[in-house]
């Protein structure tokens, strides 16, 4: 099982259409990947200004971006039988999601789902920046998950 908490930029839990989509697509991704461990994670919806600030402070990159993932290191995770293991936190810029949906000529829902799945895979240890093979594997998996969910390009 995957427990997803969706928060706004004021750390209030959300239950709107965006939050429902992200929870559903991440639950689908969890099942698609046949994960056995119970996990918990947070998804934070922010604007470009906030994600720029986070990117600058934690990644030394002075610009806004679409999604940032902060995975808990395996050694930092607490393992208790029957209790969901904390994966980490995602920050998704809704400003970027809207702009990229227009740029890539697909729906906002598809872009938001893509960013959520992309970040989720990073939390699981996938890293497209390591090599071309790692990029092909991660992006291929993202596409299969989104297509399986019914969100095509």
Swiss-Prot record:
Question: PANTHER family, alphabetically?
Answer: ENDORIBONUCLEASE YBEY, CHLOROPLASTIC (PTHR46986:SF1)
Top-level taxonomy: Bacteria, Bacillati, Bacillota, Bacilli, Lactobacillales
> What keywords are assigned to this protein?
Cytoplasm, Endonuclease, Hydrolase, Metal-binding, Nuclease, Ribosome biogenesis, rRNA processing, Zinc
One of the entry's Gene Ontology molecular-function terms is: metalloendopeptidase activity
Q: Does the keyword Metal-binding apply?
A: yes
**InterPro entries with a match to the protein in the record:** MetalPrtase_cat_dom_sf_prd, YbeY, YbeY_CS
Location relative to the cell: Cytoplasm
Give the enzyme's main class according to its UniProt record, as a single word.
hydrolase
* E.C. code: 3.1.-.-
Task: Write down the required cofactor(s).
Answer: Zn(2+)
Family, as annotated? Belongs to the endoribonuclease YbeY family.
What is known about what this protein does?
Single strand-specific metallo-endoribonuclease involved in late-stage 70S ribosome quality control and in maturation of the 3' terminus of the 16S rRNA.
UniProt-listed GO biological process terms: rRNA processing
Q: Which Gene Ontology cellular-component terms appear in the entry?
A: cytoplasm
- The entry's protein name is Endoribonuclease YbeY
Q: Note the SUPFAM superfamilies from the entry.
A: Metalloproteases ('zincins'), catalytic domain (SSF55486)
Chief site of localization? cytoplasm
Q: Which residues does Zn(2+) bind?
A: 118, 122, 128
Cofactor comment text: Binds 1 zinc ion.
Read off the Pfam families from this record: YbeY
